[in-house]
């Protein structure tokens, strides 16, 4: 009987000890990350997993600092579609040696960095602006051209995506290429201004006066049209074909050569049937006697032909 009582006492003692041991084990603090360990550049040594998650998440959310010319831009990783893979990094950190460097995995939504860069380009890029031609006080005037700016998108997407994935947050500089305008005040070509009332043709290079010619313009019944036109065709030694007009009724085409009403050169304008040409009728120059075209002395028409191009602007004004 005494043996049974002793055995029961021992078993009861062991049970109490087991309960105490379990209670003590449950009360043990959670494991800490070894000293000196970093995750993605964030020190987490000595922290609990929960505290380490918070520290790594906070560090990852530091905005990227982007420099675009004189503009400083801050953007958080979530805007770039980036999410840190923290759990796996914490698991590695818990079993790492002290002072270990643990990389932080980053998941990036495909296309998100490119979409962000596209928005930057839309806001900060600007197209090149060509010089524009106007007529002011009977003279050609050109607006000032302006260079454009174009973001190097491919490099920008690569640099931003790499930075957000590797933990870099500063020193990200994006570049814009200067886009030169095609048409400038300096390279603008010839411009013609015809003053119908005074029967004068002025040739300019851009805004700069070059030469003056006396011409013949249309008579009252067949006035030379007013407006802005361009040279659309240039012919050497042209044929003359009678137009569909009462004054040319019954006339036959005239081949190139002496007596051709168009002389040796034809510079057709964007106004149908109207052009600048030579004439064998030198006595008509200086008067309003044509059927709408602009006549010139043949040698002068040949010279002008060589100094204008298809597309040259022709202003015809009443003055």
PLM-predicted stretches and their roles:
Residues 33-40, 60-64, 71, 129, ...:
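Envelope-exposed proteins and targeting segments
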Residues 80-91, 219-229, 287:
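Short, surface-exposed linear segments at secondary-structure transitions and domain or protein termini
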Residues 32, 162, 166, 244-319:
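Exported/periplasmic cell-wall-interacting domains
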Residues 30-192, 199:
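Short glycine/threonine-rich beta-strand-turn micro-motifs
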Residues 1-15:
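N-terminal export and membrane-targeting signals
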Residues 22-30:
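Sec-dependent signal peptide cleavage junction
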Residues 184-280:
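Gly/Pro-biased beta-strand-loop elements
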